[in-house]
C-alpha cells in the first residue's frame, strides 16, 4: 500500500502529475483543487495517496492532506461513485465546499458536477451526511475553502488544449469541455487557470 510520496515533480499534465521518488516515477491522478497547489516542475512535493487496483490497471490518486484523502475514500464507498467520479467531484469543488453542500443538502450544486444526476446527488447527501457524523472532529479547516491560485504562465493554444483535455479526463464531453474553455479563454491564462475558471463557471 502506497500512502505517501515525497519526491521531485517531473511533469504536470492535468489532472496527472509525475513524481520521481528514489529514481522511480509515479504517475498520480489528482483532483484539480489539489493540483492547483502543487509546486512547479523540478521542485519537491509531498502527496498523500490512495492506491486502487483494477483488473486492467493499478492507479494512484493523490491529495495535499490526509483530510482530502479521507473524503475521497468515503466518496468511493458510495454506491455508483468510483474513483474517476470522485476525482471529478473534488475537481469541481473543494473538499470543504463539498462537505458544505452535503451538510446543507444543496442538490442543485451537486448536479452541476460532471456525472452527477439528481438521484446520485441525493444519494451522496444521504450517505455522506451519515459518514460525516462518524468522523471525529471537523473533517476540514476553514483554510481548505480558500481560493487557490496557480502560477501564472503565458497561455497558448496548447494551454487551451490542455485545459480541454483535462476537463474531458474529469468526465465532461469533448464539445462541452471546449465550450467551457472558450468562454473564459484569454491570452495571459495558463492551462491550470483555464481549468480552474472553467470549473468555477460551471458551478
Curated annotation (Swiss-Prot):
GO terms for molecular function: ATP binding; four-way junction DNA binding; four-way junction helicase activity. Residues 143-154 are annotated as: Flexible linker. The keyword DNA-binding applies. It comes from the Bacteria. Residues 155-203 are annotated as: Domain III. GO terms for cellular component: cytoplasm; Holliday junction helicase complex; Holliday junction resolvase complex. It is found in: Cytoplasm. It comes from Escherichia fergusonii (strain ATCC 35469 / DSM 13698 / CCUG 18766 / IAM 14443 / JCM 21226 / LMG 7866 / NBRC 102419 / NCTC 12128 / CDC 0568-73). This is Holliday junction branch migration complex subunit RuvA. Residues 65-142 are annotated as: Domain II. Residues 1-64 are annotated as: Domain I. The RuvA-RuvB-RuvC complex processes Holliday junction (HJ) DNA during genetic recombination and DNA repair, while the RuvA-RuvB complex plays an important role in the rescue of blocked DNA replication forks via replication fork reversal (RFR). RuvA specifically binds to HJ cruciform DNA, conferring on it an open structure. The RuvB hexamer acts as an ATP-dependent pump, pulling dsDNA into and through the RuvAB complex. HJ branch migration allows RuvC to scan DNA until it finds its consensus sequence, where it cleaves and resolves the cruciform DNA. Has three domains with a flexible linker between the domains II and III and assumes an 'L' shape. Domain III is highly mobile and contacts RuvB. Homotetramer. Forms an RuvA(8)-RuvB(12)-Holliday junction (HJ) complex. HJ DNA is sandwiched between 2 RuvA tetramers; dsDNA enters through RuvA and exits via RuvB. An RuvB hexamer assembles on each DNA strand where it exits the tetramer. Each RuvB hexamer is contacted by two RuvA subunits (via domain III) on 2 adjacent RuvB subunits; this complex drives branch migration. In the full resolvosome a probable DNA-RuvA(4)-RuvB(12)-RuvC(2) complex forms which resolves the HJ. Its main location: cytoplasm. Belongs to the RuvA family. Disulfide bonds: none annotated. Keywords: Cytoplasm, DNA damage, DNA recombination, DNA repair, DNA-binding, SOS response. GO terms for biological process: DNA recombination; DNA repair; SOS response.
Amino acid at each position: 500500500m502506497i500512502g505517501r510520496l515525497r519526491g521531485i515533480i517531473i511533469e504536470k499534465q492535468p489532472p496527472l502529475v509525475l513524481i520521481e521518488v528514489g529514481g522511480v516515477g509515479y504517475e498520480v491522478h489528482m483532483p484539480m483543487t489539489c493540483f492547483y497547489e502543487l509546486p512547479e516542475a523540478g521542485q519537491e512535493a509531498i502527496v498523500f495517496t490512495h492506491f486502487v487496483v483494477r483488473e486492467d490497471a493499478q492507479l494512484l490518486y493523490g491529495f495535499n492532506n490526509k483530510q482530502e484523502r479521507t473524503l475521497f475514500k468515503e466518496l468511493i464507498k458510495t454506491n455508483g461513485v468510483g474513483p474517476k467520479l470522485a476525482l471529478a467531484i473534488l475537481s469541481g469543488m473543494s473538499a470543504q465546499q463539498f462537505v458544505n453542500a452535503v451538510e446543507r443538502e444543496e442538490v442543485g450544486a451537486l448536479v452541476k458536477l460532471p456525472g452527477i444526476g439528481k438521484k446520485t446527488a441525493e444519494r451522496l447527501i444521504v450517505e455522506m451526511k451519515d459518514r460525516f457524523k462518524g468522523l471525529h472532529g471537523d473533517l476540514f479547516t476553514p483554510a481548505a475553502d480558500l481560493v487557490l491560485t496557480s502560477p501564472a504562465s503565458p497561455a497558448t493554444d496548447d494551454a487551451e488544449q490542455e485545459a480541454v483535455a483535462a476537463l474531458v479526463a474529469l468526465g465532461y464531453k469533448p464539445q462541452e469541455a471546449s465550450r467551457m474553455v472558450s468562454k473564459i479563454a484569454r491570452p495571459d491564462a495558463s492551462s491550470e487557470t483555464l481549468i480552474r475558471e472553467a470549473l468555477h463557471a460551471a458551478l
